[in-house]
Structures are given as structure tokens and as C-alpha cells.
């Protein structure tokens, strides 16, 4: 639609592995001539800092290798945070990034993954809802996750440059992805717990057009999946009855033979 109107469509892209299947699908649709990215402007959501000259860790290169080099987005429409900028110029570089986003009319969409600590982009626990693009120290949990996912022996830098929570929330729509049971616990907290800066992804609950895209594994601890009788009417299978009985016994601290009619109601 943006292309037909001659407008830019501005995307903030995360580089996490949970987004790879999304990018693969976008490339597939491009190859089938179902999509074009000629009017797309891309802003990288975060970058490691400081980076060595020939670093293999650059997230923008990961985005290009997986997605951008395989579609028709113009090179001049791809922007990234500068992992090589001098330390005394970091703040100015981050401010310029915010200004450049505004120059293109703001973000239309943000595609994000979520880390085990509830971080989005590189916004670690403690990031405020009004935070803008800035430098941030990488937390221990995120560092372990990065070391496991990055296929390199190169040392992860101490910091990241990242779009802030407010920057991401300014997008017209947001998509958060997570796959597998290892993300089930954090997704339950992100979706169902209270909004808190100790869980940055929970701020997405405040957005009117935020979407969570997860598989059954990552959804495992959501109430609708794990305890559906609490939120909807159920078709009671033997397995579901057993699950509900175990849950009720644990909740009341009673063995099953001690349950009464009152407990069931």
C-alpha cells in the first residue's frame, strides 16, 4: 500500500534468531513477487558497542545476510546504530538516530524478539517506558544468551546501542515473536503479569496495536493454554480433567480425596 501511495514504510528490525523464520517468510513472498520492499526504510533496533573494525558480531550484517540482501530494499534506506563511534560521540549519534527516524515520518512497524530477561531490542531490566535510543550495559542473562546464539568465538562487547522503549512504542504496530518452551516462562510474565520496568517487554501491554506471535511451546504457561478452565468454557477430556484436579489440589493444598463439593465450586 505504501508503495502504491509513493510513501515510505519504516521498519524497526531486531536481529534475534526468533525473527529468522519471519524474515525467511518475507524473502519467500518477495521471491514469489507477492511483496516489494522498494519503499521500505529499515532501522536496526540495536547494535553491539564498541565493535572491533572487522567484527563478525554486527547485527546489521546479520540482518543483511538473513533478509535485506535477498530483497529489493535500497541500500540508502538501511540505517544502523554506529557500533564504531567514538565514546564521546555516542550520545550525539543516538540523538541523530532518533531524528532520522522522525525525518521518515516515524516507525510504521517494529519486529522484535524477546530475551530470557524480558528484554526487547537491547533494553535490559530497569529500562524506563520513556527511554530513547541510548547506550546500555548488557546484562548477564542477555550476555549468556548472546554467547550461546552467536556462532563466533569473538567476545561479546560490554554494551549495546539500542532503540529505547519509547522509541519502539512509537511504532504504529509492534510484533513480538518467541518460539519454544524455553521462552514459555518469560512469555507468561510478559503477557499476563503487571507492567514493570524489571520486564521491559511488558511495556508492550500499553500499546494499542501490539501483537504477540508465539508457538504452542512458548505459549505453554499462558492461562488459556495451561489452565483454560479459568478463562473460557472447556471441552473436558480425561487429560484436561486430570490437569484441573492436580491444579485444584495444589491451589488448596489438599489431597484429591479430601476435596469437597465446596472446593469444586
Task: Tell where the protein language model's regions lie, with residue ranges.
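Solvent-exposed alpha-helices and their adjacent loops that cap or buttress functional pockets
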Residues: 4-5, 34-36, 71-72, 101-105, ...
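Class I SAM-dependent methyltransferase SAM-binding "motif I" and its flanking Rossmann-like core
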Residues: 121-165
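Glycine-rich beta-strand-to-loop/alpha-helix junction loops that act as flexible
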Residues: 13-18, 112-116, 179
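A short secondary-structure junction signal
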Residues: 90-92, 120-126, 131-133, 186-190, ...
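Ligand-binding beta-strand-loop-alpha-helix segment within the catalytic cores
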Residues: 33-109, 232-256, 263-264
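ATP/nucleoside-binding phosphotransfer catalytic cores, i.e., glycine-rich phosphate-binding loops
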Residues: 172-265
